[in-house]
């Protein structure tokens, strides 16, 4: 079984995907992939194929064309395009390569077998309320593993994807109305742009799926003002492990560290504040339980709390500081996820700089006063830098490397 076969199993005259330029039935999608497959040397030595297409539909068709052949498709991230990967052996069971987002400048490459995703589709689709009637809106490249996984999960049950490359929230709302979208998949920073542009509530949206960033009850209420009939599901996951935990809006509180309870078959343990995960749906070649080097704890209700990555701890003039803690405090002050804290070393001194999207709202003194209930003096950023927008990678995460080049 492979992903092209998965497409061929669906109702062939049903619309599979609508993009900025065109629409394709399942049959048309399969035929385009078959046309490319006819040009592939299926007798050649097994090797990885890095897909560098810019358009979502070209990424998808190329991926499907190579799926199930002796060539292993990898939809490449922008960060990886200048990287050299030394690939000695591809695991025998591997059907695809997946990459991490590369928010620090480099992407990591992992191998997946078909069942590590396909066997989980029924579980995730049940939690996300995805079925053959789903019409889901997604934005951005399939190099973001979250997008590719959601697409394939929707295709596995015969749903329809509405896809756009454009970063235009007003246009997103128009597309949702035009194509009668009932499900949205976007990361929180993109989701929370929608209330700024929506003029009327949309009762057609029944499900919102989000992840890769934090969200709390306050954020959920903003979204429910424009999508009153929706259920919001936030997940915690990783390229290496698939989905780990999830939480619905009804269970969210003001505590944005809570990421909910484990998916079926996923087990979590905590050792010295480090999160370890045991799951059958992991990439090839890792040992279990696996650590993402994330910090957290499990509360009395069995919910996991994500406290940031271990490498978010930086040394500022001899003191260990958590940039995640500072960012969460800044989110409370600025009421936006569009910010990041980065340590800087200059003139033999370490300082913290906060980058914030948008125009200056407060004086530095006002910000520091607002932060006092949450941070100690040595945790306070020394500089607040305002940019119209913060640079992002394919996953929608803030690109730290590009910001560091501005420092």
Please identify what each model-predicted range represents:
Residues 73, 95-122:
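Conserved AMP-binding A3 loop
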Residues 221, 226-231, 240-303, 311-313:
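Conserved AMP-binding/adenylate-forming
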Residues 13-43, 81, 88, 112-115:
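Conserved AMP-binding/adenylate-forming core of the ANL superfamily
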């Amino acid at each position: 079984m492979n992903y092209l076969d998965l497409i061929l199993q669906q109702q062939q005259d049903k619309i599979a995907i609508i993009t900025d330029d065109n629409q394709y039935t399942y049959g048309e999608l399969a035929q385009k992939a078959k046309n490319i497959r006819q040009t592939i040397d299926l007798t050649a030595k097994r090797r990885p194929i890095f897909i560098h297409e810019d358009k979502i539909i070209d990424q998808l068709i190329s991926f499907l064309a190579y799926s199930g052949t002796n060539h292993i498709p990898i939809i490449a991230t922008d960060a990886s395009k200048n990287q050299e990967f030394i690939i000695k052996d591809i695991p025998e069971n591997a059907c695809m390569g997946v990459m991490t987002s590369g928010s620090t400048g480099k992407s990591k490459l992992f191998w997946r077998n078909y069942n590590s995703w396909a066997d989980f589709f029924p579980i995730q689709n049940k939690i996300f309320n995805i079925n053959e009637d789903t019409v889901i809106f997604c934005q951005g490249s399939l190099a973001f593993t979250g997008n590719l996984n959601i697409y394939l999960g929707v295709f596995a049950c015969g749903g329809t994807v509405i896809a756009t490359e454009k970063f235009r929230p007003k246009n997103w709302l128009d597309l949702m109305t035009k194509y009668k979208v009932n499900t949205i998949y976007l990361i929180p920073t993109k989701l929370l742009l929608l209330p700024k542009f929506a003029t009327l509530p949309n009762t057609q949206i029944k499900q919102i799926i989000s992840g890769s960033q934090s969200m709390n009850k306050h954020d959920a209420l903003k979204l429910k003002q424009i999508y009153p009939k929706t259920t919001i599901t936030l997940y915690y996951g990783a390229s290496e492990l698939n989905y780990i935990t999830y939480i619905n809006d009804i269970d969210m509180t003001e505590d944005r560290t809570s990421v909910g309870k484990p998916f079926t078959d996923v087990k979590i343990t905590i050792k010295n504040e480090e999160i370890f995960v045991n799951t059958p749906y992991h990439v090839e070649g890792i040992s279990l339980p696996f650590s993402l080097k994330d910090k957290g704890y499990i509360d009395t209700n069995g919910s996991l709390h994500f406290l940031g990555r271990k490498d978010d701890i930086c040394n500022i003039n001899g003191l260990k500081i958590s940039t995640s803690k500072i960012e969460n405090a800044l989110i409370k002050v600025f009421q936006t996820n569009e910010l990041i804290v980065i340590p800087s070393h200059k003139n033999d001194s370490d300082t913290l700089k906060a980058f914030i999207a948008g125009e200056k709202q407060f004086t530095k003194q006002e910000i520091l006063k607002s932060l006092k209930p949450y941070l100690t003096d040595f945790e306070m950023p020394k500089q607040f830098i305002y940019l119209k927008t913060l640079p992002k990678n394919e996953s929608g995460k803030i690109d730290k490397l590009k910001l560091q080049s501005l420092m």
